[in-house]
């Protein structure tokens, strides 16, 4: 089996490639390294460096069995500062991958976002990811291209970014804790998030890809799967896990943020036999043990 992973040098893409290689896939990555890192490269994967917002996909003559389209400029705040760059990158790269998949009849698993449920017009990022979903459904219905949409909920885990505009909440807290810095929290910290470990996300992606390639794929093609833990925590509760008395600083509320994310759709449970089994508190406890020694 041969898989193409876009965004393969980034947070989720790197974890996905590690899993695919362990499952004996041949893997090729495309990444423009805007947030991906070459130190994330995995032995056994072939990496290409170019921008998918341009209509070009390198083709060495080998047909891929499945495409995992993970590449995107993520995060709400950077997209508010530069909406054109975010929309150009996210929408055009998705359109180009779908057209490539259509030309070769290659199934595509698309990385969606739970922001679709909250404020699809609240930021360029949310709109661009929602628009990508619409393009997937268009190509599925008009051109019979097998597609699956997997929506992510506040992903955390190995290879997450620890600083900069694209860092995750957990990544920022981890960096601040390691450096004995105050934890920074936007707004009042009461906003709740469904945090999902990247290994669970990867498991959902791989199961989606396998389902598209297996018998009965007509049931799977066109589906939208919510990949969330089904449990949410306030940011204050997450900060408490690093120590109830650990210092924290509250920053002004930011535009585009929403009050709650929570996965309640069990479609992935029923059709993919997917279950999230990683626990946020256990993850943070392990982090503290590793860094308090």
What are these regions (language model features)?
Residues 9-12, 38, 114, 159, ...:
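Gly/Ser/Thr-rich beta-alpha loop segments that engage phosphate groups in nucleotides
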Residues 51, 178-293:
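C-terminal substrate-binding subdomain of Rossmann-fold SDR/epimerase-dehydratase oxidoreductases
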Residues 1-155, 177, 205, 274, ...:
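N-terminal Rossmann-like NAD(P)+-binding domain of SDR-like oxidoreductases, especially those catalyzing
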Residues 124-126, 130, 134-193, 198-209, ...:
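NAD(P)-dependent short-chain dehydrogenase/reductase
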Residues 38-41, 60, 160-164, 198, ...:
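Short aromatic-enriched loop/helix-cap "lid" or pocket-rim segments at secondary-structure transitions
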Residues 38-39, 133, 171, 232, ...:
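Short, surface-exposed alpha-helical segments at coil->helix boundaries
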Residues 7, 88, 126, 164, ...:
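Residue-level marker of alpha-helix boundaries and capping positions
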Residues 16, 120, 160, 200, ...:
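Acidic donor-diphosphate engagement hotspot in glycosyltransferases and nucleotidyltransferases
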